């Protein structure tokens, strides 16, 4: 299967075109970039990996409810940005709805879940049933899912990746935290990224070289123990609530794809996407 990190991949391609190619953000541009990112992935991977699953974010997510500072800085930066994020999200929702009506892909969205949770559940399931699978995403968090059957394609690098030791990589992520998601390293307090210009407490490579291989976690102090478990809960995809994981797999199993080429044509023509309609077979 092809697991597409829907909004993240589409937004990344938009940002590249906006910054490097000087494109102007309009409804037409956003629709084109969203659909073209889907078309490109489908054309590139369908023969080897089969059907595509569009993995979507729900408007609410359990991590934000569990950790109030989750993606705090990212959300703040968006509010202060010149980019019309409302337009982007409106177009993402619109395309998601249209895909469900006639495009030949599975759309999986689960209440209170991010696309990460869906990819985590289906990536784990793919390894269990030994189904060759590619995760299309730039996100380093998905390295933990790599296996004999699951690899990752990073569009930003135009390259496949399969980490030789996903568990070790995951542990390093937990120790270092994830600044992009507002998760500090294990030496740093929860609210660190809410304070402009403040530096995290240093993580020294000589310590990491020891800690990574300490399965007993004996290096944890009272100060860092709670922070380690905080990061583990937010980064390790096996900590996704079981009801979300189960629902994602069930939706994958029961979802029926009903491609409807006439409806796809109607959609392209109505939205003046003639250039994509000329490549309609790439979507099939």
Where are these regions (language model features)?
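Extended two-metal-dependent nuclease catalytic cores across DNA- and RNA-processing enzymes
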Residues: 20, 48-49, 76-267, 271-283
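Domain-level signal for Mg2+-assisted phosphodiester chemistry and nucleotide/NA-binding surfaces
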Residues: 1-97
